[in-house]
Amino acid sequence: MASRRVLLKLSGESFGGGAPLVDPDVVSAIASEIVRVSKTIQIAIVVGGGNYFRGAELSRRGMARDRADYMGMLGTVINALALQDFLEQAGGDTRVQSAISMSQVAELYVPRRAERHLTKGRVVIFAAGAGMPYFSTDTVAVQRALEIKADIVLIAKNGVDGVYTDDPQINPNAKKIYKITYREALERGLRVVDSAALGLCMEHGLPMRVFGMESLRDAVSGLKVGTELSQ
């Protein structure tokens, strides 16, 4: 029986524990959780860069959107290298693949090569987003999941444990949704995950689970935590 293969999306904010830059203790704890479950599950990871730069936010403040997005992509490379280091300290075997060529620190992203790494038990970390501006890392996570034939996309969120009817940090009456279709999520304008990412999943029948960082190991292991999204 083939191993379960998952694509895990980690937000940049999770690397700083909600603060800017990288908190070594936080990343070490994340890495330890991943290594524990990587013995029996093939894990690929897309990392965000929001703890350094957010392209959309920089653009709103007057910077050219494409340049701002490239800055965000470079932030994801920093996070990928930090995660790689702590994964290896915890005993994991890893590879970083970047969508932008930087051969001194990462392989160039090649889907077939990534699949080979996964079958050999390596944790593969995808960096630099899509290598092009105007794509969120949520959307890139779905693209990568489709390309490496992952069974599910797991979206780990910092500060929220699933999809809600409204922003729970603003509206205390917001209700958690445990299961929802992509079409309903799009029609209701639920914004926890990028709409382009939801549309891609809906088009290709790829399941998704959105959950809080505290449930990372359970989500990767296949337990029903957070919110399940499907067709």
From Swiss-Prot:
Enzyme nomenclature, EC number: 2.7.4.22
Subcellular location: Cytoplasm
Catalyzed reaction equations: UMP + ATP = UDP + ADP
Reported regulation of activity: Inhibited by UTP.
Pathway: Pyrimidine metabolism; CTP biosynthesis via de novo pathway; UDP from UMP (UMPK route): step 1/1
Listed InterPro entries: AceGlu_kinase-like_sf, Asp/Glu/Uridylate_kinase, Uridylate_kinase, Uridylate_kinase_bac
Chief location: cytoplasm
GO CC terms, sorted: cytoplasm
Pfam families: AA_kinase (PF00696)
Oligomer and partners: Homohexamer.
Function: Catalyzes the reversible phosphorylation of UMP to UDP.
Protein name: Uridylate kinase
Annotated organism of origin: Tropheryma whipplei (strain Twist)
